[in-house]
Amino acid sequence: AATLVLAVAAALVRPTARAGFVAGGPLELAVDGLSAAVVVTVAAVGLLVLVFATGGIRAERPRFFGLMLLFTAAVMVTATATTLTVLLLAWEVMGAASYALIAFRWREDAPVSAGTTAFLTTRAGDLGLYLAAGAALAAPVAGTGAGDRLALDALAGLDGPWLHLAAAGVLLAAFGKAAQLPFSFWLSRAMLGPSPVSALLHSAAMVAMGGYLLLRLRPLLESAGWASGAAAWGGALTALALGAVALAQRDLKQLLAASTAAQLGFVVLAAGAGSVAGGTAHLVAHAAVKSLLFLAAGVWLAALGTEDLGALRGAARRDRATGLPFAVGALALAGVPPLSLWATKDEILAAVESPALYGVVLAASALSALYAGKALGLLLASGPPGTAVREPGEETAEPLRTAPLTLLAAGAAVLGALALPPLAGELKRAVGAPGEPSAGAATLAATAILALAATATAAALAPRLPEPAWARAWLHLETAAHTLAVRPALATARALARFDDTVLDRAVTGTAAGVRRLASWASAADRSGVDRAVRGVADGARYLGELARRPQTGQLHQYYAQALVLLTAATVLLLLLR
């Protein structure tokens, strides 16, 4: 609660905090119009998810809540970072915390494998931020220090190929975190984490930060030219393809996971098309909708022990305390007016100029209504109750369950006002985009009719809607990633290991053996040559000493005789020399 109060205060005051870090690269956080909306959203959704988890998480509570708070803090720092230095620090902590939360049940193999897949997949995209930082530092900019070059606002001013490298790196990092094509499959695996983790991860936290990064760096995309189109088309195609994936799912959490990637596709599209305000409104509204839906799914998973839509048939009708908020969230996800995602999608659609892109976005919007209608139709249908297999540690006390769901349902119902007059104009001014287009009455009416018709059709035909295997398998994206990236990487690693063993290790081992032999030879030479010479000198000195000692008898008459001999010899020598 204190974090939410501080977030609201920061949104009103718009503070800036700065501290020294490394030479030329200070740590700086700032709240502006865009980050204010995101910070308040993260704090509000995080608070409600944690309240829900208070009644639902029984095992290892200190570790769970500590990781959730760390995760939320990293998201808040990501949203307020003004330099690549701070952004990278928060980005890394956010990724590490997500791994720990997805793999929270670390004694089980499946969650650990899921956390590893999510972590490594997003890490592959994270390399793009390092590419962007390298481009910013390498670019020739006169009169600026490293800190100025690494400022997010300065990236749009890079010249030549450095600008395009930075844009490519940012797109790669954002697509990885936002689960856009081709990275989307990691969201499917992330469903093995606890339900509150899924609710926060998919709504206001890590996945949302991918879209937020592109909204923040819209000037960079615009300066690079091609990057705007790449973001727009990448987001639109993800919304379309993952919408088809969501429609084919038989598992509620898998349907919601695919819809997360699809809905973030609209945010990425907004960044590319130049609808920063529309993307922000959609990001905020989607956070309320998706956290609500995941928490409700967690309630039914705990109560019935299943996520299968067939087994959950009629669950929302029987459990009205959960079913009514879920229905509000599902209708909002479908884009049914006047609920939140109806107007926010149209605000984004208003910025799309390409007819082909417009058609793709309309089709993706229709798919949103279809997959939301499918889930709603099955969960509201009459039928036998699911098998009661309650999972210990996942039950949620009634007040701690209903209060967050009710508040999130209220947000899912009203947050679309951010994309409607007069709040739409205020939001555009707050994010510094007063000239962005708005959806007209005709567009709003047409999309409303489309959403209502598609939702009603899907709800009526829910059990008979097509579920192609390629879509149910998430487009086989994980298989493709293993084929195109993982297996070649492992094969390369094995080849390098063999090269290391057969060439490098052999060279090192051979060198060591040669050095040992040389040392052995040197030791033998030392023993046979140097040691013998030293001993010879010592023996000679000892022999000479013995010779010199013989005349030393201690007898005086012998000394006289020796002196007489020496004197005689010296006299003879002198006579001979003359």
Report residues per predicted region.
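Alpha-helical transmembrane segments and their helix-start/interface "positive-inside/aromatic belt" motifs
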Residues: A1-A2, T116-D126, R317-P325, E395-A409, ...
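Membrane-interfacial helical/loop segments at transmembrane boundaries in membrane proteins
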Residues: A17-G24, D148-A156, E347-A351, P422-A439
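Short aromatic-rich membrane-water interface segments that cap or initiate transmembrane helices
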Residues: A23-A37, A156-A167, A350-G359, P434-A441
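Membrane-entry segments of alpha-helical transmembrane domains in multi-pass membrane proteins
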Residues: E28-T41, V77-A90, A227, A281-V284, ...
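Hydrophobic transmembrane alpha-helices and their helix-loop junctions in integral membrane proteins
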Residues: L48-L87, A96-A388, P392-G393, A417
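Juxtamembrane "helix exit" motif at the C-terminal ends of alpha-helical transmembrane segments
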Residues: P338-S340, A417-E426, L567-R578
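Hard-cation-handling environments
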Residues: E394-A454
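Aromatic-capped, Gly/Pro-kinked transmembrane alpha-helices
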Residues: V431-P437, L465-R578
